[in-house]
Amino acid sequence: MLRFKELYQQKIIENLQKKFSYKNKHEIPQIKKIVINMGVGEATANSKVINNAVNDLTLISGQKPVVTLARKSIATFKLRENMKIGCKVTLRKDRMYDFLERLVIVALPRVKEFRGFSYKSFDGKGNFTFGLKEQIVFPEINYDKIDTIRGMDITIVTSAKTDQESKFLLSGFNLPFYN
């Protein structure tokens, strides 16, 4: 079994119950899914770039991503409707916990000048979104084989009703916060 899943089941649930005194076990917040999005702006000029982004995201997540398409045309960006502009992957269950573990233990310590996440990254409904500027912080990515350094947006969707509950939940997984 995964370490972070065991950590949630054995310690975090108990700590959440003590702090917020829930009446029902189904009220206890949990992580529902993790969405990783990689926007590829240069795909408008070169359509082969999207394949490299898909390969990178496949290595990082362990799951094949979905290619995202433009919803409408924007002339200033030389963008037409249904053009490939990025890729995303949604992780649930065991893959979600596996990714979260690799993110916290391996990837975040490799980010340059990383002090922690701001509490302002919560959306008011218990979800947490942050961005990484480089995909090379993940050990699965070979620096010599990438064409360009790309960033990504990572959203952690929780069942928490408030940001305070979500902060306490994610702090239990050792996500570093400052403020």
UniProtKB/Swiss-Prot annotation:
The organism's place on the tree of life at top rank: Bacteria
Name of the gene: rplE
Name of the molecule in the record: Large ribosomal subunit protein uL5
GO molecular function: rRNA binding; structural constituent of ribosome; tRNA binding
Signal peptide bounds: none
InterPro entries (alphabetical): Ribosomal_uL5, Ribosomal_uL5_bac-type, Ribosomal_uL5_C, Ribosomal_uL5_CS, Ribosomal_uL5_dom_sf, Ribosomal_uL5_N
Functional note: This is one of the proteins that bind and probably mediate the attachment of the 5S RNA into the large ribosomal subunit, where it forms part of the central protuberance. In the 70S ribosome it contacts protein S13 of the 30S subunit (bridge B1b), connecting the 2 subunits; this bridge is implicated in subunit movement. Contacts the P site tRNA; the 5S rRNA and some of its associated proteins might help stabilize positioning of ribosome-bound tRNAs.
Assigned keywords, A-Z: Ribonucleoprotein, Ribosomal protein, RNA-binding, rRNA-binding, tRNA-binding
PROSITE patterns for this protein: RIBOSOMAL_L5 (PS00358)
Keyword Transcription: no
Family matches, as SUPFAM superfamilies: RL5-like (SSF55282)
Family, per entry: Belongs to the universal ribosomal protein uL5 family.
One Gene Ontology term from the biological process aspect of the record: translation
Assembly behavior: Part of the 50S ribosomal subunit; part of the 5S rRNA/L5/L18/L25 subcomplex. Contacts the 5S rRNA and the P site tRNA. Forms a bridge to the 30S subunit in the 70S ribosome.
Gene Ontology CC annotations of this record: ribonucleoprotein complex; ribosome
